[in-house]
């Protein structure tokens, strides 16, 4: 069987590293500062809301995800992604993505099942087995209570409530703060900042309907860039079969 070009393999790898990878949030512009008085008053509320969101996220075993990237984010070839993922009884993901292959933008569908990533990248309608996904990126990390989105919520620093806002049609409370660059790298599968950067501006939108679900998260890895992950259908069970 003919092996796909290196550029295609790299792009397929990027699908994995984003499928469930980036769940980060908030642009520098979004992380606006409230007055000192308001900030002091909102810190306690932010801590409580983040605790509730962390607990809720740790219980999520499946969901729909939508990724959007603005600007040229270091080490990130995926510019857009939408799909479903669940980790019970095993990690399964399906969806579509837009990636940079060389200097060209290409659309591809993907299926992650039985520890393998299948994609029609470079060959629309014809799926290639890109091997054991866990050897490239541990796709279950997004829902991992200790390394994934729950960990990011639990360790958000300098958190402050920035008001109420509709996110993806859901009423939410917006919270701004900073995430560890190392935590972002763990979640993304690669470092999105230079080695000397310690924190990444992060914004989260938490559902205010009592569920405390994380609706959206955005990070600003470098100047004029952002990575936004929007979630819905929490608890969704995803099934998939190996593409023929």
Swiss-Prot record:
Chain segments annotated as transmembrane: none
Signal peptide: 1-24
InterPro entries (alphabetical): LolA/LolB/LppX (IPR029046), LppX/LprAFG (IPR009830)
Family annotation (PROSITE patterns): PROKAR_LIPOPROTEIN (PS51257)
Keywords per UniProt: Cell membrane, Lipoprotein, Membrane, Palmitate, Signal
Lipidation, N-palmitoyl cysteine type: 25
GO CC list: plasma membrane
Compartment(s) where it occurs, according to its Swiss-Prot or TrEMBL record: Cell membrane
Membrane topology annotation: Lipid-anchor
Lipidation (S-diacylglycerol cysteine): 25
Pfam family, one: LppX_LprAFG
UniProt similarity note: Belongs to the LppX/LprAFG lipoprotein family.
Protein name, UniProt field: Putative lipoprotein LprA
């Amino acid at each position: 069987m003919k092996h796909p070009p290196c550029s295609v393999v790299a792009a397929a790898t990027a699908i994995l590293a984003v499928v469930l990878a980036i769940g980060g949030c908030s642009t520098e512009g979004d992380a606006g500062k409230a007055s000192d008085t308001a900030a002091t008053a909102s810190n306690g509320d932010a801590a409580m809301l983040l605790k509730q969101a962390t607990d809720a996220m740790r219980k999520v075993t499946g969901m729909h995800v939508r990724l959007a990237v603005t600007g040229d984010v270091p080490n990130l070839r995926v510019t857009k992604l939408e799909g479903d993922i669940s980790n019970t009884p095993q990690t399964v993901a399906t969806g579509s993505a837009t990636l940079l292959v060389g200097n060209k933008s290409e659309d591809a569908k993907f299926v992650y099942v039985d520890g393998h990533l299948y994609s029609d990248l470079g060959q629309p309608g014809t799926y290639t087995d890109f091997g054991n996904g866990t050897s490239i990126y541990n796709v279950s990390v997004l829902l991992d209570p200790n390394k994934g989105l729950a960990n990011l919520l639990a360790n958000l620093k300098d958190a402050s409530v920035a008001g109420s806002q509709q996110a993806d049609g859901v009423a939410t409370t917006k919270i701004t703060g900073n995430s560890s660059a190392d935590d972002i790298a763990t979640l993304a599968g690669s470092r999105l900042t230079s080695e000397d950067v310690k924190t990444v501006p992060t914004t989260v939108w938490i559902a205010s309907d009592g569920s405390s679900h994380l609706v959206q998260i955005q990070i600003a890895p470098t100047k004029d860039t952002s990575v936004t992950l929007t979630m819905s259908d929490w608890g969704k069970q995803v099934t998939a079969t190996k593409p023929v």
